[in-house]
């Protein structure tokens, strides 16, 4: 049986880990290198590092901090933010990332997905999609959730998977930071259309939210930030709870 994964997320702005709600109201939390070290020791299955303002500010991702983070951990590291070209993929992978997350860059130039998959393999290309309901439709947002692209999220995600994305990280803007549970309706809609590992992001508030999430078909991992950063829920405690309730975890 394939084990499920618990993934903490470091949203980094100006070299610091930050956290907001519904992608707004960003507050400073901690140093990313210290947090990466802590999560590695705490039993996280993977770590996600997002430079959350790189795309909006039209610049490249912070490679100096990323290199330090990568050197401190021994679990898979996925990195995103400001990834717009194959050169960006190269730079991020050379810093120590295992997988590269692409979001706004693919929306600007969809050919980036098949080109990256051809060069590095599908397993290296993670589609990150920021999704929000607009007039009853799931829509894709760009630039850190600031810009409505007008694209149907389900169609966009399906296209990316068909063209080389090997994993999907689905960020629900509607549930982000609210701590009332994952966006199961959106996740189910995506899982019914694609057959790749899906990481659910946005809305985790308690361990029961993860248990409910993993009862839904096609969801491989739960990602969270605030509840882990603020120590409202320990990763080891969460994994032991899930394991005891029939969800296979790596302990």
Per-segment meaning from a language model:
Residues 11, 39, 47, 79, ...:
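Conserved, mostly hydrophobic/aromatic
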Residues 73, 77-96, 185-221:
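Catalytic cores of alpha/beta
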Residues 12-14, 18-19, 97-170, 174-175:
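Conserved anion-binding
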Residues 91-112, 172-177, 203-209, 217-236:
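Glycine-rich phosphate-binding active-site loops on the catalytic face of alpha/beta enzymes
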Residues 60-67, 110, 150-154, 180-188:
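Charged helix-capping and loop-helix junction motifs
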Residues 5-9, 46, 74-78, 99-101, ...:
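Structural preference for beta-strand elements that scaffold enzyme active sites
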Residues 53, 61-120:
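Glycine/small-residue-rich loop that forms an oxyanion/phosphate-binding "nest" at active or ligand-binding sites
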Residues 46-64, 104, 169-180:
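Glycine-rich, proline-tolerant flexible connector loops at the mouths of alpha/beta enzymes
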């Amino acid at each position: 049986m394939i084990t499920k994964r618990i993934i903490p997320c470091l949203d980094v702005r100006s070299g610091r880990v930050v956290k907001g709600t519904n992608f707004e109201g960003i507050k400073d939390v901690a140093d990313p290198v210290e947090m990466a070290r802590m999560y590695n020791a705490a039993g996280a299955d993977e770590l996600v590092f997002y430079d959350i303002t790189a795309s909006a500010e039209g610049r490249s991702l912070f490679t100096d901090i990323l290199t330090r983070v990568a050197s401190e951990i021994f679990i898979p590291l996925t990195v995103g933010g400001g990834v717009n070209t194959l050169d960006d993929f190269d730079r991020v992978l050379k810093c120590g990332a295992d997988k590269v997350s692409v979001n706004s860059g693919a929306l600007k130039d969809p050919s980036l997905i098949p080109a990256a998959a051809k060069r590095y393999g599908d397993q290296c290309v993670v589609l990150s999609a920021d999704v929000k309901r607009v007039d009853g439709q799931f829509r894709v947002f760009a630039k850190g959730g600031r810009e409505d692209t007008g694209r149907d999220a389900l169609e966009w995600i399906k296209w990316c998977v068909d063209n080389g994305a090997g994993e999907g990280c689905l960020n629900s803007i509607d549930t982000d930071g609210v701590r009332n549970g994952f966006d199961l309706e959106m996740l189910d809609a995506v899982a019914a259309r694609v057959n790749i590992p899906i990481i659910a992001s946005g809305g985790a508030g308690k361990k029961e939210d993860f248990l409910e999430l993993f009862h839904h078909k096609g969801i491989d991992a739960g990602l969270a930030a605030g509840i882990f950063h603020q120590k409202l829920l320990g990763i080891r405690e969460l994994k032991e709870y899930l394991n005891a309730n029939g969800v296979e975890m790596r302990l």
